[in-house]
Structure formats: C-alpha cells, structure tokens
Amino acid sequence: MKNIILITAACMLALLSTIGASLPYPILPPLFAADAPNAFNHFLGLPSKLLFGLALTINPLGLLIGSALLGPLSDRYGRRPLLMRTAVGAAIGHAITAWALVIQSYPLFIVARFITGLLEGNGAVARAMLADQLQGPLRLRAMSWLNGAFYLGWLVGPILAGATLAWGVTVPFWIAAGALMLVAVLVAAGLPREAPSLLTSSWWQVARDRHSLNLLRHEELRTLFIVQLALTCGVASFYEFYPLWLVETAHYNAQAIAWVNVGLCGSMTITSLLAGGPSRHAPLLRAGWYGCGIALAIGVLAMGNIWVGIAAIVLFGIPNALYNTVIQGWCAERFSAHGQGAVMGLLSTTFCIANIVVALGGSLLILIDTRLILVVGALCAAWSAWRMDGWRRHLHAADAAALKAAA
C-alpha cells in the first residue's frame, strides 16, 4: 500500500508540473493579441509580441534552474520535506499568477511564473524518491509511469485551460493550485519521515557546491551528459519545430496541430505505462536502439510528405518513452553513489539546456528551411546512439577488468 501511495504521489507531482508549464499556451495568445491595449499586454509600452515571448520563456527558465538545484538540495534536506514545500510553493505560485491576471500586473505575472517554474523543477526529486524507495523491476516500472505522467501533463494542461476558460481566465490556475495542495497532503501521507541529516552546510552552500552540473567533474557522468545532450537536442528539435513543419507542409491551424499532439502524447503515455519490464539485453544497448528509433522518426519527418510525417510524429512517442525509461533506470543503478537527486537533476537539466540550444540554433536554420533543423536533430540523435554503443563496450571492458583485479 505504501508503494502505491508513493508512486501515485510522484506521478501526480509530475503530471501537475507539466500541466502548470503548459496551462498558459491557449490562455496567453488572446490576452496579448487583444485589440485594446492595457497594463498587461502593453507593459511599459513594449510590443505585445515581446511581452508574450517573455511570458512563455520565463517558466521554462525557472524549470531549468529548479532542475539543477532541487535534486541536490533533496539529497541534503530529504525528499519528503522538499517535495511538500515545493508542492505548496508551486500552488501559491499558481494562485499569485491568477491574482496577477485579475489586477493586470505583468511584472507580478512574470515573477509568479518564474517562481512556479523553479518549484515545479521538482521532477528530479520525484525520480530520486522512486530510485531511493523502490528496487528492481518495480523501480523501472515506476520510472516509466512517472515519465508517462510528465507526457500526459503536456496534453492535459492545454485541455484543462480550454475546458475551464468559459468560467474565467484565472480558473485553470486555481484548479492547478488546489490539486497541488492535495498532492502535498498525499506526499505527507505516503512518504516515510527521513532521519535528520548530520550535515551542517547551508542551503546556499549546497546549491552552490552540489548543483547537478558539478557532476561533470566525473568522467563517466561527463560522457553521459554529452550523449544525453546530443540525443535531447534531437528530441527538442522535433518537439519545437514539428508544429511549424505541419503549418508549412499542410497549412495546419492550431486545432489540427492539437489533434496531432494528442496522438503523440497518447503514444508516449501508453508506451510509458506498458514499459519498464525486465530485459535480457543491457540497458545501454537498448538505449542505443531506441536512440536510433528517435533519429529515424525525426529524419522521416524531415523528408516525408504530410501523411508519412504525421505517422512519424505519432510513432516518435514510442522510442522516446522507452529510451527515457531505460536511461533513467540505468543511471539510478550506476550513479547512485553521487546522490539520486543530483543524478536525476543532471538528466532534467540536460534536457532544459538542449531546449535552449535548439531554440537558438533552430531560429537561424528555419530562416533557410525548417527541414534543416529536423535533419540536424536526426543526426544528433543518430550520433548519440552510435556513441552510446561504443561507451557501452568501453564500460563493459572496464567493469570486467575491475572485477578481475578485485579477484
């Protein structure tokens, strides 16, 4: 029963973190496209498109910083207290966001969205919690279900916003705030109390000295970062630019793109719920296979017609979900000595960095042709899969030599 509550709490946190990030997507465009200028959409007389871009960017920026810091902080202060506090804090952040919309305060809205994103970077803590408390096949399945919850949030967020907007623009944020408060109660009930840490370092020292990127001082984790960054650059190129490909190839509108997104999120969610079982193949070998599948889907999208492209978009979700399940489970086993919070934080931070890199590079490449960024993304994913296979062979040889020396 405890495991059920534990996994449910982690999945609810994951679901609500991505719901929180995706809630504004259908809400903000009408606010900034309004014909009548107001204090919100023309703050300081700045162009509304500039304000809109900042409003969309600020929450993922908070997620990036939170992903790097919250995992290591949970290694120091414990998963339970940090998850409870970040859930309550994110709920308050959603409430302040709603209030900012009511009073049309753009600065308050930006601050609230940043802080909410920072606190919703607790996905690394949720992963570390499962890695700590569960073992073997159950751990892999729980990690897979957690990923499914993350994917589902990107689908549910815009749907929730669209379904409740009729009652007011602030209603979706109040619903998210209430749900997060319930999750905090679930965490309090489902997680056992942890023994107080004997360390005396302050939170600032932990944040400064033990953030996830400090793990790059270790050779194996440096290699992990490189292959993961290459693969997630491919994934980010797909996520960020397949909607533009649909617009340019078949003149899809927002509603048509949303239906394609439903298919993608559905394939990722279903695969995540079914994945995580035992396998006789080495984790890195399987990760390489799934990386090849990701590269193939992106490449087919770049080169195919509209129907082939839509099939590639939906099917992309299968290898992507399988890859994340395998690599997270393997990292939890291989690098547990470095702290599960820091390790899971490194994976989350890497994906955030990839999104920023691809957004900047892609904005230049699409000036020539949108397919270029997709081709580059496919090549990045293919290189990562190839490099992963070589790394697997190297680690196997090194582990065998270490066992022989120990004997």
Positions of the model-derived regions?
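Transmembrane alpha-helices of Major Facilitator/SLC transporters
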Residues: 257-279
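C-terminal ends and interior cores of transmembrane alpha-helices
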Residues: 88-103, 293-304
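A late C-terminal transmembrane helix in Major Facilitator Superfamily
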Residues: 338-367
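Helix-to-loop junctions at the C-terminal end of transmembrane segments
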Residues: 65-78, 271-283, 366
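Hydrophobic core of transmembrane alpha-helices in multi-pass small-molecule transporters
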Residues: 93, 106-121, 308-322
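Juxtamembrane intracellular "pre-TM" segments in multi-pass secondary transporters
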Residues: 1-2, 192-225, 407
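Short amphipathic helix-loop junctions that connect adjacent transmembrane helices
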Residues: 26-49, 240-256
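Cytoplasmic helix-loop-helix junction between adjacent transmembrane helices
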Residues: 112-150
